Amino acid sequence: MNNPVFLSGLNKIYSRFDIFFVDLWGVVHNGVECYSNALKALKNIKKSKKIVLISNAPRPSNNVQRFLNKINFRKKFYNLLITSGDLTRFYLQNKNKNKNKSFYHLGPNRDKSLFINLGLKKTSLNKANFVVCTGINNNKDSLNKYFSILKKIKKKKLKMICANPDLIVHRGNQTEYCAGSIAKLYEKMGGKVKYFGKPYKYFYEYICKILKEKYKKKINKKK
């Protein structure tokens, strides 16, 4: 399926699929509270189908689950939760040529769980071999604040790993920039970026790999 199909309700496609991928932010919650109708829909789907929550949160899924618990979104509403943070960790641990080298973290301290037990050393920009971007440091920051640091990163010709490709997010009534906006700005400056998360193919391949291992079934991607 190459083009999106706009539906009036899930009942139009419900019988065609065994597993539903459901985004979190903007679909299930707004960063502050859950949408009651979304919870009702998930509860009905889970009666006979499997639900996989997917998120561009630049943190491990267990960390995101703790946040979901705070807004009363419980495990009973889904089967699996997979984040762009999970994929980023998988890459840094298994695929990254910079393994065991030093990195500079461009992002808030709340995302530090992304790097736990990876065998990587967090360091200053001057000593870094590559950069991991997880977002803006303060929710109210504008992109202009990051021109200076991006120029320094570009001067050192460092590759950037973007752990959240989203450009913006709405937290309640507030709009915030995400790591994707910083990464796109770095690309415009001529920097190299590798993205992990929606809508990139690598993320969905990673999810299908996990599902195949967990449920011992081959995923029919053509459907």
Predicted regions mapped to residue ranges:
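HAD-like aspartate-dependent phosphatase fold
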Residues: M1-K223
